[in-house]
Amino acid sequence: MKNVISLTDAAAKQVKLLIEKRAKPTFGIRVGIKSGGCAGQTYYVEYADNKNQFDEVVEEKGVRILIDPKTLMYILGSEMDYVETNFKSQFTFTNPNEKANCGCGKSFSV
């Protein structure tokens, strides 16, 4: 079976760092998509304080990732990375389901 989502070492390290710095207990991180951007959908990453009833839970490299069922089919097989450059740092996604993305790389369509 295909992994729902995988993390690079850099992404796992950054998620662990963010959770350690957070002032309140954290169940994991939530990864999803929402409407937005010029291509139609954007990714989001946020703290997850608890697991919702139907969340898919993936544990990889010491990180707990929660994905709601509406997002699952759109990100199946994706890889989450963390990239730092001189001017910005961000989580990025390589998604085999993407059909198109915008020129700036902020949004995509499936």
From Swiss-Prot:
InterPro entries to which the protein is assigned, alphabetical: Fe-S_cluster_asmbl/transfer, FeS_biogenesis, FeS_cluster_insertion, FeS_cluster_insertion_CS, HesB-like_dom_sf
One GO BP annotation of this record: iron-sulfur cluster assembly
Gene3D superfamilies reported for this sequence: HesB-like domain (2.60.300.12)
GO cellular component, one term: cytoplasm
Origin: domain of life: Bacteria
Example of a GO MF term: 2 iron, 2 sulfur cluster binding
Matching PROSITE patterns: HESB
Record-stated family: Belongs to the HesB/IscA family.
NCBIfam families, per the entry: iron-sulfur cluster assembly accessory protein
Protein name: Uncharacterized protein RP484
UniProt source species: Rickettsia prowazekii (strain Madrid E)
Organism classification: Bacteria, Pseudomonadati, Pseudomonadota, Alphaproteobacteria, Rickettsiales
